[in-house]
Amino acid sequence: MKCKYILPSIIVLVFLTACNHPKTGDSKQQTGLIFPHGKKITNNNFTGTAYLQTLVAADSLNSISVGNVTFEPGARSKWHSHPAGQILLVIDGVGYYQEKGQPKKILRKGDVIKCPPNIPHWHGASADTAFVQVAITGREKGETVWLNAVTDEEYRK
């Protein structure tokens, strides 16, 4: 019963706090966002520098995880998929999202992306602007399946 209120509450909290953040007038990552920057991601599933702040860890009561991910300019994930899908809430900056076989989408603050289950995709920052997203990932059907790195050619397309 309580679990069905967690996701809507997180979405409302994220958008209320993001909407109240003052503009600085430049395209660089803004400071003062509600969630901490997090720890540098040190695994090989990313190109460039990215940071993760876990907000909600999946457990026996709730099968979703929620994380705030900050990508420095040019940083991106590998191609990957999620057995139960994923939702991305864009908090700041300019980023990219691409599903295999589809054109790359440009993401900006306030955009929401629904990543379908088992569809290979990648996401990350634009070449010259940092990017911040909240990733909401279903874990009930398994963990993220990591694939190949996004090539520089794929990234530039």
Language-model segments: residues:
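C-terminal motif of bacterial Sec signal peptides marking the signal peptidase cleavage site
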Residues: 16-18
